[in-house]
Regions:
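Terminal low-complexity/charged segments
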Residues: 1-209
Length: 209
């Protein structure tokens, strides 16, 4: 596959790590040559503070919260460092074409306008070899802070809103997107509030009984 860096198998799932510079080429190959005709979701993850890099002022606290101490945040050991700060995960489906039912035959019975047929004894059950089922794969790219990624809207139009969400919440820019604007927050909102370095402030509220 074009741009393939690594193939990972875990928990029955396949992840294809791809060179960001060849993302569109890889996605086009998966659509045209491997049958992955539907993009279900794009999930962006911020790994700031993951591994052995200290983060000062993590999520806006005064002194910062060190995620690198063993046992912190429920971690029994230090996690392995990630290749870059952000991961973009593209969840793809290969949905087989729907086949038209065969015409009624002499052995079929009709109930309330519906044709009912007995399943042939040699028909393979759903989910077994011999019967085409939906396949899944995850395409993953790693990005540094501020590093853009090419839009895959020309490959799968469903990427439109997903890429806008990644921009709105994480600040990941999809170059070539037809309308890369905020999708959840106001247009004049400052920053991208699902980033781990986004300052979470607050105003004291006085309650009276």
């Amino acid at each position: 596959m074009p741009g393939l860096v690594e193939r990972k198998e875990a928990h029955g799932e396949t992840t294809l790590v791809v060179d960001p510079a060849r993302l569109v080429e890889a996605c086009t190959h998966l659509r045209d040559e491997e049958g992955f005709n539907f993009l279900a979701d794009i999930a962006a993850t911020d790994y700031l503070g993951w591994g052995r890099c200290g983060v000062a002022g993590y999520i806006g606290t005064t002194a910062g919260r060190d995620l690198n101490l063993p046992g912190s945040q429920g971690l029994a050991k230090l996690p392995e460092p990630k290749p870059k700060r952000f991961a973009m995960n593209y969840h793809l489906l290969a949905i087989p074409p729907r086949q038209a039912p065969p015409p009624p035959d002499a052995g079929a019975r009709v109930f309330s306008g519906m044709v009912v047929r007995a399943v042939p004894p040699d028909s393979p059950p759903r989910g077994t070899p011999g019967r085409e089922t939906t396949r899944r794969v995850r395409v993953q790219v790693w990005l540094d802070d501020g590093e853009p990624i090419s839009s895959v809207v020309p490959v799968w139009p469903t990427a439109d809103w997903h890429e806008r969400e990644a921009w709105d919440l994480m600040g990941i820019r999809a170059e070539g997107h037809p309308n890369l604007s905020r999708i959840l927050m106001e247009d004049d909102w400052e920053g991208h509030h699902l980033r781990k370095d986004y300052p979470i402030g607050g105003e004291p509220v006085r309650f009276s009984g």
